[in-house]
């Protein structure tokens, strides 16, 4: 069975997902937005308590609220960041993005370890997430679609009750 655990993290109430195969314990983290230490503990605690093996750290896009926890995931689970290269410029100015919202970043963001492109497949046990490139909210926005469960993870491409924002840099 595909298990989907949702967390709301950081001052922006960003959604972070841990997607796992209950049989193999393999999982992916989508949009590690955990900013505060207690949020990081909640995320890693869930993964450790459920004996999950993190295979992927997937970013739907590289706006800061979706990536505050990338370094924590990398340091804790030794998994690099997977994101679309069209969003790489956002990593270069993440400190400036944060200061616009009165947020301090302790460390620079981790770089993209694996570039994701249209139709790339990410296997989690017997399940597959297919990458669909949907520029608009950001140039590198990605939806991860699981055909077997008919579910999509799209970051800020859609908001509840509206379309996602397209007025941000690169949108």
Regions inferred by a protein language model and the residue ranges of each:
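Short Pro/Gly-enriched beta-strand edge/turn motifs at strand-loop
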Residues: 1-3, 100-104, 125-129
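Conserved beta-strand positions that form and line the central face of beta-propeller blades
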Residues: 6, 18, 29, 90, ...
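Active-site HxH/HxHxD metal-binding segment of metal-dependent hydrolases
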Residues: 34-123
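Short Gly/Pro-enriched turn/cap motifs at secondary-structure boundaries
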Residues: 7-9, 105, 111-113, 133-135
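Conserved beta-strand hairpin/beta-sheet module of binuclear metal-dependent hydrolase folds
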Residues: 1-50, 143-155
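Accessory terminal helices/loops
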Residues: 1-5, 78, 166-171
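Metallo-beta-lactamase
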Residues: 25, 34-35, 97, 121, ...
């Amino acid at each position: 069975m595909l298990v989907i655990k949702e967390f709301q993290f950081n001052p922006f109430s960003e959604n972070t997902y841990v997607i796992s195969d209950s049989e193999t314990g393999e999982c992916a983290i989508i949009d590690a937005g955990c900013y505060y230490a207690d949020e990081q503990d909640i995320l890693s605690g869930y993964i450790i308590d459920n004996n999950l093996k993190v295979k992927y750290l997937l970013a739907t896009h590289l706006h800061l609220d979706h990536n505050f926890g990338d370094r924590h995931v990398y340091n804790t689970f030794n998994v690099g960041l997977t994101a679309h290269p069209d969003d790489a410029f956002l990593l270069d100015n993440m400190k400036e993005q944060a200061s616009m919202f009165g947020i301090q970043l302790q460390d620079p963001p981790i770089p993209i370890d694996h570039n994701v492109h249209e139709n790339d497949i990410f296997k989690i046990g017997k399940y597959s997430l297919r990458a669909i490139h949907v520029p608009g909210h950001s140039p590198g926005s990605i939806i991860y679609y699981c055909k077997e469960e008919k579910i999509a993870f799209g970051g800020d491409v859609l908001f509840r009750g509206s379309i996602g924002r397209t007025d941000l840099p690169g949108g």
